[in-house]
């Protein structure tokens, strides 16, 4: 019994010296750093997802405009809505000057989360057929993109989540519009979402 205890103690000492604590800690530290560093495969997947969304949003705009070129190319402004749609600014770190990958990813992810209530509104307006399917698919694809980007954000606590109460109030405000205003609002949302995705694609290519 004494021989077994001594042998066991010797084995534990060998294991402890073979794997120093500093080595294990260094490996954990390296893993935490590389976990947020995008691989070539993950970056390619992100770009493909964004490009796909841009294409689908453009198709939705065409359907909404009934393929009228003037309508498609115009960026309508419905001033009475006072919509606070997400936009990119220089301070977000996504532009050529002052590019900051971490700040940019936080802004992109937060912006996509802000757009969700507007995409839900559009989905509800498209009642049936291909329009409804495409609207649902655009929203689900944008949610998938958010999850991809969350994995690359260095500090997820910096991501800003919209207030559920504010979203409920916004939906009520949008629903109170007349039919013409609703169509113009949908066009405004889609054109701004497309612009946001274009900025996102350019920023992700730099990462």
From Swiss-Prot:
Gene name in the database record: IL6
Biased composition (Polar residues): 31-44
Residues with PTM Phosphoserine: 74
Compartments it resides in: Secreted
Subunit structure: Component of a hexamer of two molecules each of IL6, IL6R and IL6ST; first binds to IL6R to associate with the signaling subunit IL6ST. Interacts with IL6R (via the N-terminal ectodomain); this interaction may be affected by IL6R-binding with SORL1, hence decreasing IL6 cis signaling. Interacts with SORL1 (via the N-terminal ectodomain); this interaction leads to IL6 internalization and lysosomal degradation. May form a trimeric complex with the soluble SORL1 ectodomain and soluble IL6R receptor; this interaction might stabilize circulating IL6, hence promoting IL6 trans signaling.
Name listed for the protein in its UniProt record: Interleukin-6
Signal peptide: 1-18
Gene3D superfamilies linked: 1.20.1250.10
Record-annotated disulphide pairs: 65-71, 94-104
Ranges where the record places region Disordered: 26-47
Predominant localisation class: secreted
